[in-house]
Regions:
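Post-cleavage N-terminal segment of exported redox proteins
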Residues: 1-35, 135-142
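Aromatic- and Gly/Pro-enriched helix-to-coil junctions and flexible linker segments
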Residues: 27-142
Length: 142
C-alpha cells in the first residue's frame, strides 16, 4: 500500500505527464513552418492605431508570451520562434478559430470577439487579411 506522500507524488507525476502529452499533441497538430512564415510575422507588424503585438506580449505577465522583439525588428531566430510557437499553441483550439483565444481575444466584439483585450481590438472584422491568415492556420490543424 502507498503512503499518502507517495500517492501525492504519483498523482502529481501522472498529472504532469498528461499535461506534457496534451501540449505535445497540440503542438504536433499545428504546423510550425506555416506558423513561422505566415502567422508569426503578424505579431511584429505595425497596425494603424495599435502597438505591435510583441510590444505588449513580450512581458512576463501575459498568457500569450512572445520572445523579446528582435533588435532590428525583422524576425526571430528559429529557437525563439519555437518558444513563441509553444506559447501561441496554448491559445489555439485546432480546427476551430472562433474557439481559439489567439483569434477571439484581439477581435472586436461586433465581429465575434471578446471584450477583454487591453491592447484594443487588432482586428475589427473576420475579413481582415491577418485575422484570416491566422484563422486558416488554426483551421488547417488536424
Amino acid at each position: 500500500m502507498m503512503s499518502g506522500g507517495m500517492r501525492k507524488k504519483t498523482i502529481g507525476a501522472l498529472a504532469l505527464a498528461t499535461v506534457m502529452t496534451s501540449s505535445l499533441a497540440l503542438a504536433q497538430a499545428l504546423d510550425f513552418e506555416t506558423y513561422r512564415t505566415r502567422v508569426e510575422p503578424i505579431f511584429l507588424k505595425k497596425r494603424p492605431g495599435h502597438a505591435r503585438c510583441v510590444v505588449c506580449h513580450e512581458a512576463n505577465n501575459s498568457a500569450f508570451r512572445l520572445q523579446p522583439k528582435p533588435p532590428d525588428g525583422s524576425t526571430w531566430t528559429e529557437e525563439q520562434s519555437r518558444k513563441n510557437f509553444e506559447s501561441v499553441s496554448h491559445l489555439v483550439k485546432p480546427g476551430d478559430p472562433l474557439s481559439s483565444k489567439l483569434l477571439k481575444h484581439p477581435l472586436a466584439p461586433d465581429a465575434g470577439g471578446d471584450e477583454f483585450h487591453g491592447g484594443g481590438w487588432q482586428f475589427v472584422s473576420q475579413k481582415d487579411a491577418d485575422w484570416m491568415a491566422i484563422a486558416e492556420w488554426v483551421r488547417s490543424a488536424k
